[in-house]
Amino acid sequence: MSDSLIRLRPWPDILYVSQGRAVLATDRDGFFDGGSQRGLFVHQTRLVSRWRWLVDGRPWTPVALSNVDQGSWMGYYIVLPPGADPGERDHGSGHMKADSERTLELRLSRRVGDGLREDVDLTNFSQQATRFTLAVEVGSDFADLAETFEGEERQQKGELRRSWREPGELAFDYRAEHGQAQIDRGLVIRIEQAGSPPKWEDGRISFQVELAPGASWHCSLAFLPRISDLVGAGLAPAREGVNPAPTFREEAASFSTPESETLAPVVIGALMRARRDLADLRLPDLDEGERSWTMAAGLPLYIALYGRDVLTASWQAGLLGPEMMDGTLRALARRQGTVVDDWRDEQPGRMLHEAHTGPLAVLGFNPRARYYGSATTSGFYPVVVSELWHWTGDRERVRPLLGPALEALRWLERYAGDNGFFDYRTRSSQGTVHQAWKDSPGAIVDEEGRPVEPPIATCEEQAFVYVARLHLSELLWWMGEKDEAKRLFHQAGELKKRFNDAFWMEDEGFFALGLDAQRRPIRSITSNPGHCLAAGIVDAELVERTAARLFEDDMWSGWGVRTLSSHNPAFNPYSYHRGSVWPVENGSFALGFLRYGLHDRLETAGRAMFEAARLFDHYRLPEVFSGHARDAAHPFPAIYPQANSPQAWSASAVICLVQALLGIYPYAPWKMLLVDPHLPEWLPELTVRGLRV
């Protein structure tokens, strides 16, 4: 094991506690004062913008603060008891401070659930009685998460009312309108079990406290959100000790390995962390049943349903069980496009890209309450239906999903197919410009680093349609739809031939990023062709050269495959899609290397990812990290400034990498599990328990 002291953490200045739709984001001291992205958020709405405990108007000194798990947190704070003599300054070896020798302790315990519960415990560890005012500063603004970013202006103009109700409830009520839309949200902070009566004055809840030596004082605060404009989001406290996914945690596959000096303990740590993170990102309000659920894409920015993200995460994590695939497929089927609505980039059959519940989306300042601007989601949906079939062989479970899968393919053929390939463009005034795998505004550049404007047919989108047709044809054959199965099978073969002819660049030994509006190759060297390997669209004679190009120095950082070649003028190791490294991509690429028997490439990619995981707190890979070269000057990668962590598809990438190393693939319709392990020396042994096929 490494004795390195490197421990990386995204968002190093913010502490997060989260469960479901609720996120508590504080400064490093456990409090917050209305700063950027800090507060208690429920459904992307900042219900509490200021929260700070004081003793006689003075701050507490934090001495130990930590998450207990993703949904709970505890902090220790101390001060010298008010009125106590600080005494002489200590100059001995202990360098003792007065507040550590005569201590008034504040212990805060928080659990996030449907809302928040905070338990407040005071203990007088001094040898004299003390009297003081304990107070907490409270503020609320009901800002959308996006409005809390530094430099962002507030768009919604609502009415906020505040009221105090005896014996101890502080209520905030907020209403806003925009066009025909309106929201009605609120928060009650209820004081329970208080050791002395509360008082509300000048933005503070205060208590008069008297403590004898060794005595304690307690109160509990329940934060009860009200989101009346959303169905199923009502008033409820945080539920102490509630596990968001108990059945999954009991039944999901688990992993172990003997202790050794190899990477094996890191692999196990990363696997078990990923397993927990996926459960912690669960969105209970979207549950389709105890064994059928989906998750948010990532914390803190993506606590929402993102179609392609959760489709990817659910199939990559299939080794854990089918619950996520089942719940995700059903949740998206319920939200499949039905009409032509250019504002939302919606068309019949198109699969949802994202669904937000914050004020700006619900009020219609943007189309994100239900937005369809992704080509990838519709291509992925049939693939994941097929994966669910391969893992379960359950006709009753899969058959209702066939219709939505076919409609998603028909959408691609009707709205995205052009001249034999599949492209994208937005029709919305606030739509996503790039709607393929890489969807940031500057993601698509040519070999000179110049932006390319849609319509664009990217290489990976052709691969996704290919594998969707191929896998769905097999499933339709099983279901007796043989004519449609034959049609899709032949279409897949024809697309593969056209793709290899049109996208291959012989002089580069690689595939073009895409075809532009004039169907000219976009000749930039990117990670996108790695997805083509994963999907199996690459002709056999081109596989070795394609894989080798991904591992040349300009593409391989030493921690993973970069999104864009470092030789491209637009390369930036910090850019979202122009030079960074994404664990989710490298997880998919691993299955591509396995598909073509490239075990050396698989081992290299896997080792790099787990060596990266070793550098991060809890072995938790973030959404994306920088593409700096791994060398003596760069002993660890930087982190993309806005990276989510945990991120669903970074967690699933870890599971996917191990599945590839184990050579596991299920075929439940034939009651078959294929196992062809190629474990490297850094992972000599691995035990999987509870695998369900």
Identify the role of each PLM range:
Residues M1-A279, R291-W293, A297, L301-A304, ...:
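Terminal accessory carbohydrate-recognition/targeting modules of carbohydrate-active enzymes
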Residues V79-G83, Q208, E261-L305, L329-Y371, ...:
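Extended glycan-interaction surfaces of carbohydrate-active proteins
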Residues K97-S109, E159, P197, P348-G379, ...:
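Aromatic/His-enriched, Gly/Pro-containing loop or helix-boundary segments
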Residues D119-R131, V384-V398, A405-W411:
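Hydrophobic or amphipathic alpha-helical targeting/insertion segments
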Residues D309-V340, N528-A540, N586-L602, G606-M609:
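Alpha-helical support elements that line or immediately flank enzyme active sites
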Residues S314, S378, P382-V385, Q462, ...:
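TPR repeat positional signature
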Residues L388-P400, H471-R487, F593-D600:
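Inter-helical turn/loop segments and adjacent helix faces that build the functional surface
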